[in-house]
Amino acid sequence: MPEANADSFTAIVFNDLHQRPHIFEALLKQIKDIDYDFVVFNGDCIDDPANHEQATRFASLLTEGVHGDRIPTLFIRGNHEIRNAYSIGLRKHFDYVGGKTYGAFNWGDTRIVMLDCGEDKTDDHREYSGLNDFTQLRNEQVAFLEQELSSKAFKKADKRILIHHIPLYGCDNLCKELWEPFLKKAPFNVSLNAHTHRFAHHPKGSLGNNYPVVIGGGKNPENATVMILEKKKGELRIKVLNTEGKVLLDIVE
């Protein structure tokens, strides 16, 4: 980790790869000349894990692709990581701080808050046979948000980035009713999301959002994206590229 007063970094964010190596490889080509400090996989990358071999094979491909042996690599759960026979076993492969799939940390003078939206369907949906309890997970994060947003680390940060898989804006999200009362006043510079398989940029205030929202694309060559975050002193730049290297978004917050 960098020094607490470090004011510059570059990070890469992938999402919704759905275990498609050719999509990952196409996006890697677009960032091959970038010297990045850490990487985030924002959900639905190791989707519907059936068994140990399947899950670890693709997880290894991802970490090797971004040099995870020397570059910090973060995995945020999407709704598809918590489906199928090996979904519980998948958790064992990641070092969740305090055993929680959500949390916050500082990268230099930037605060990064990660949330876990759980499933995109209610717990009583017929698919789950009464075995899911993501309502409790969402409620847990209400207390976490209340504590985090009032913390010294959050308040002192130069920039603040929110990351979670299912968008609160531009998409139905079961977390919105619980979390929005806290987030609508929180001074985040940007929220990075995924899930919809459609790249989108919702400027601050366009959907009642208190911060800009950037949603990554999907799992096919024509809609997959990779995000590049570049923090240089007081400036945070967010770029989004497609599989051909076309710049879909380039904003400074």
Where are these regions (language model features)?
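Short acidic, glycine-rich surface-loop motifs adjacent to enzyme active sites
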Residues: L149-C171
